[in-house]
């Protein structure tokens, strides 16, 4: 049994991982054992999402999934013995507990969820917190890094109905400690809706996949080719702007642009590193697709 734990923390994921009073009886006991001597970074979505949204596929509330190891694994970034955080460095590559690939652009406060994620997403780092290790079941570090991100990853999520939202709000303990209070902006809501529509309509995904292939075929071997990238984004925009599915999006072009950049990230980065081979690449100055 844990020697000490805090009052319930408002963020369900942070609370589930770091504030378990009885780790031996927890549904996450195997995860705790796996992480016992490891250093790791936790990605924490906003409390508003975790408390008031549910997963489309499983139909389970996100706060319930915070006690599901399969769900949590994607939010844990493993650190090696030589890993350290340098926010002035170029991109850092991490592996999640379940083997997925995450790239962090520290200078831009951006996280790319890439290989292994069935939904590739670009996430914004809203805040970075250092959490002192107050429990006795993690021995890998005296402090842990929590990156608060702007949305959940690796799942399609939708709001609960009004009554369920009200019910969840009432369930927040009065002594809960906020870790911070993060707002959900309108662009993020549009981006989530945009991605959900695409995954509900496979024909659209197929069409976009053909444009991804066009970029890979037409762009020269070591040249990211801004003109070709912009051309295929414009093609997608022209084909979608009159579609009733997307007519209510006020930032449709930007949503398409971000979606293409995210899904072609590996190709673009490979071309950049080949093009600048032997030179230090400053990702802050490379704004080809911005």
UniProtKB/Swiss-Prot annotation:
Question: Which domain of life does this protein belong to?
Answer: Eukaryota
Which InterPro entries does the entry mention? UPF0507/Ank_repeat_27 (IPR051248)
Family label = Belongs to the UPF0507 family.
Q: What is this protein identified as? A: UPF0507 protein YML003W
Origin species? Saccharomyces cerevisiae (strain ATCC 204508 / S288c)
């Amino acid at each position: 049994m844990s020697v000490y734990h805090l009052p319930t923390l408002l963020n369900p994921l942070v609370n589930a991982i770091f504030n378990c009073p009885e780790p031996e009886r927890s549904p996450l006991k195997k995860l705790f054992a796996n992480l016992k001597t490891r250093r790791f970074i936790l990605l924490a979505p906003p409390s508003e999402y975790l408390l008031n949204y549910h997963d489309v596929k499983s139909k389970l509330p996100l706060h319930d999934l915070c006690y599901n190891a399969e769900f949590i694994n994607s939010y844990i970034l493993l650190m090696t013995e030589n890993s350290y955080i340098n926010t002035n460095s170029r991109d850092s590559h991490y592996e999640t507990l379940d083997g997925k690939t995450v790239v962090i652009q520290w200078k831009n406060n951006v996280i790319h969820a890439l290989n292994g994620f069935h939904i590739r997403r670009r996430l914004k780092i809203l805040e970075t917190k250092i959490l002192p290790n107050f429990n006795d079941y993690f021995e890998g570090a005296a402090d842990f890094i929590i990156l608060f991100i702007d949305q959940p990853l690796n799942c399609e999520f939708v709001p609960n109905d009004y009554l369920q939202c009200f019910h969840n709000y009432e369930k927040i303990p009065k002594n809960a400690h906020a870790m911070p209070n993060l707002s959900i902006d309108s662009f993020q809501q549009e981006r989530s809706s945009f991605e959900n529509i695409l995954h509900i309509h496979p024909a659209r995904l197929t069409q976009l996949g053909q444009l991804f292939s066009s970029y890979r075929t037409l762009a020269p071997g070591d040249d990211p080719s801004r003109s070709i990238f912009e051309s295929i984004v414009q093609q997608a925009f022209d084909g979608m702007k009159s579609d009733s599915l997307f007519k209510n999006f006020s930032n449709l072009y930007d949503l398409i642009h971000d979606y293409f950049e995210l899904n072609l990230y590996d190709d673009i980065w490979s071309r950049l590193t080949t093009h600048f081979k032997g030179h230090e690449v400053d990702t802050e100055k490379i704004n080809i697709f911005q």
